UniProtKB/Swiss-Prot annotation:
Gene Ontology MF terms: ATP binding; ATP-dependent protein folding chaperone; isomerase activity; unfolded protein binding
Subcellular location(s) of the protein: Cytoplasm
Main location: cytoplasm
Source organism superkingdom: Bacteria
Name the UniProt record assigns to this protein: Chaperonin GroEL 1
TM region positions: none
GO cellular component terms, semicolon-separated: cytoplasm
PANTHER family, per the entry: 60 KDA HEAT SHOCK PROTEIN, MITOCHONDRIAL
Gene expressing this chain: groEL1
Family statement: Belongs to the chaperonin (HSP60) family.
């Protein structure tokens, strides 16, 4: 495939054109009075949204160079959304201003590398200032406010605050689609994993199709159990103790399964067999978690433990085990709190080390099952389109609320950036083009507030000057057009969202300014199909 190459100013300008087209479509959605954007779908009704990432994802430009420019800014929005669940439009607006002002200076003869260094130094200083002015989230109301702003719905904010209240900071909150209208919150006590009973004959409550064991022993085995002779010694000991038995193993099959089922049907002995969750190393880790939680040990040939030699001391205990067709819940495991805390710290250390988003998500889930709990928010809506958009918004709001708890909150509405800039630039000592880079950042910090004001039908420049003259923490409530104490009025952003937006925007701006060539694929001209043969035209 042939390639095209553009150099220097022509390359940078082409990238900028692509970026501007995407940014102009996204920035109209910023703020409480943000406008909507209609997205055409190949099939079905068009989607109407004011979510920055959804709009950015839909934009595909025809010109190859412009397309690359737009893709770079999409990356800013996506990265900010992944990290903090919000701030995508803010990041796009910041990136557009940084690039526009930066390219203007490069065209005037400034050194791109010096500008980049200046932008990076100023960004770092502003991020420090943001974290200094951030306030810790102390009340449930503050979490609700933050989540409400992200989701654009106070009911959603309240529900997320309630979920976080119940499952704690380490807990996992998932969002699922529901068949009914409205919102539902479902809380899980204890550890739950997605594996159900191996045979429906284990069911103790036929109405709810559940197997419920009170105060059971729990056998945790990282192996298949098929021979009954391996299982008999354990069964006899548990029967003598007069307790039921829950078996969590790689698989239970053959005569071992038949023996358990027959004894259950006869009423001789209550038990339930469940396949272990996960695969490979992840299964091993999750069985280890269950063992720590219940105070048992994983029975495995690797550690020299054979099934036939297992005593009651190697089995776990719990107040209750509830098993349905699809999932198992262990309530109040009898594990040693110190060992559980040690395991939690070990998982936390793994989370910090990992580079993979998927691994991080799975580790977070394991952490929640051990330390916190799991809450499920079920979302319903009238149409498929509305359901998808609503679910996406609520997922963002959950990440947003978690970000607020992590790094604290700052005044929303573009005010925090403006005020962090005030203190940050006093301490900066740069010269030449590096100082110009810092001034570009100073200019960019006004952009989000300006855009919020413009979207609300106000004069951006006038609003920025007015907010500059107000005391710290005060700004424009674009919903009412009044100037208020932002945090008291509940107009807040997580510091992590604002920080991520600026860092990601500055990172892309640096790439734009230091680009000297762009290589793109040459668009192929569509070949006209050959005309069909006309025969001999003999009539």
């Amino acid at each position: 495939m042939a390639k095209m190459i553009a150099f220097d100013e022509a390359a940078r300008r082409a990238l900028e054109r692509g970026m501007n087209q995407l940014a102009d479509a996204v920035k109209v959605t910023l703020g409480p009075k943000g406008r909507n954007v209609v997205l055409e779908k190949k099939w079905g009704a068009p989607t109407i949204t004011n979510d920055g990432v959804s709009i950015a994802k839909e934009i595909e430009l025809e010109d190859p160079y412009e397309k690359i420019g737009a893709e770079l800014v999409k990356e800013v929005a996506k990265k900010t959304d992944d990290v903090a669940g919000d701030g995508t439009t803010t990041a796009t607006v910041l990136a557009q201003t940084l690039v526009r002002e930066g390219l203007r200076n490069v065209a005037a003869g400034a050194n791109p590398m010096a500008l980049k260094r200046g932008i990076e130094a100023a960004t770092e200083r502003v991020c420090q200032a943001l974290l200094e002015i951030a306030k810790d989230v102390e009340t449930r109301e503050q979490i609700a406010s933050t989540a409400s702003i992200s989701a654009g719905d106070t009911a959603v904010g309240e529900m997320i605050a309630e979920a976080m209240d119940k499952v704690g900071k380490e807990g996992v909150i998932t969002v699922e689609e529901s068949n009914t209208f409205g919102l539902e919150l479902e809380l899980t006590e204890g550890m739950r994993f997605d594996k159900g009973y191996i045979s429906p004959y284990f069911v103790t409550d036929s109405e709810r199709m559940e197997a419920v064991l009170e105060d059971p022993y729990i056998l945790i085995a990282n192996q298949k159990i098929s021979a009954v002779k391996d299982l008999l010694p354990v069964l006899e000991k548990v029967m003598q103790a007069g307790k039921p038995l829950a078996i969590i193993a790689e698989d239970v099959e053959g005569e071992a399964l038949a023996t358990l089922v027959v004894n259950k049907i006869r009423g001789t002995f209550r038990s339930v067999a469940v396949k272990a969750p996960g695969f490979g190393d992840r299964r091993k880790a999750m069985l280890g978690d269950i063992a720590v939680l219940t105070g048992g040990q994983v029975i495995s040939e690797e550690v020299g433990l054979k099934l036939e030699n297992v005593g009651l001391d190697l089995l776990g205990r719990a107040r209750k085990v509830v098993v349905t067709k699809d999932e198992t819940t262990i309530v109040e495991g009898a594990g040693d709190p110190e060992q559980i805390a040690g395991r939690v710290n070990q998982i936390r250390a793994e989370i910090e080390k990992t580079d993979s988003d998927y691994d991080r998500e799975k580790l977070q889930e394991r952490l929640a099952k051990l330390a916190g709990g799991v809450a499920v928010i079920k979302v319903g809506a009238a149409t498929e389109v509305e359901l998808k958009e609503r679910k996406h918004r609520i997922e963002d709001a959950v990440r947003n609320a978690k970000a607020a708890v992590e790094e604290g909150i700052v005044a929303g509405g573009g005010v925090a950036l403006l005020q962090a800039g005030k203190t940050a630039f006093e301490k900066l000592d740069l010269e030449g083009d590096e100082a110009t880079g810092a001034r570009i950042v100073e200019l960019a910090l006004e952009a989000p507030l300006k855009q919020i004001a413009i979207n609300a039908g106000l004069e951006g420049g006038v609003v920025v000057e007015k907010v500059r003259s107000l005391e710290p923490g005060w700004g424009l409530n674009a919903q009412t057009g009044e100037y208020v104490d932002m945090i008291k009025a509940g107009i807040i952003d997580p510091a992590k969202v604002t920080r991520s937006a600026l860092q990601n925007a500055a990172s892309i701006a640096g790439l734009f300014l230091t680009t000297e060539a762009v290589v793109a694929e040459k668009p192929e001209k569509e070949k006209t199909p050959a005309a069909p043969g006309g025969g001999d035209m003999d009539f």
